[in-house]
Amino acid sequence: VWEGTLTDGSIDPLEGENGISWSSTGSGWFGAGIMSMQPINLFNFSEGHLNFSIKIPANVSFQIGIIDSWGNQSYVDFPSNQTTYGLVRNGNWGQASIPVEEIRGDYIDLRMLSYQFVILEVNGASCEFGLDDIYWSGGGEVLKISNSNSILDRFLLNDNYPNPFNPLTTINYNIPGDGFVNTTIY
């Protein structure tokens, strides 16, 4: 929640026992987002959708967006009383599905997302709303799953790519048996 613009609400989740419910505090705007502790790579979802369910008064305009680790922000508009991205604005629970190519904008780095979901209202509307079922879909297909339990007969050094944004990298390798290993990195 940004700058104390929202407090806990009382709207029950759409389904199950968990959801998000907030009430605006009358600050003239409100904003909040779902932020990961480390940047998330959602590049495989570039042709997918950001989906969510929301219960919000029909007369409240809002924006849904994403923010990358570089501070780039991009939003799509949900005008009051208009069906947008499949969300029917009647004050009841409804679902929206935003194509990632539309919410991404020109500068969002999907490989380094800090906020995977942001809601923002800037017209000063006071309201209570609920969010549920926030997820990204269409991230590609698994091409092949191999469940081979074969025993290694040779050393294997897997591809290792350092993260240029972090001084640490993980180096994965396999050896044919148990034992002490001395690894030197140049």
Model-derived features with residue positions:
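Beta-strand signatures of extracellular beta-sandwich domains
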Residues: 63-65, 182-186
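Glycine-centered coil/turn sites that cap beta-strands in beta-rich domains
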Residues: 146-161, 165-184
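Beta-rich carbohydrate-recognition modules and glycan-binding surfaces
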Residues: 1-144
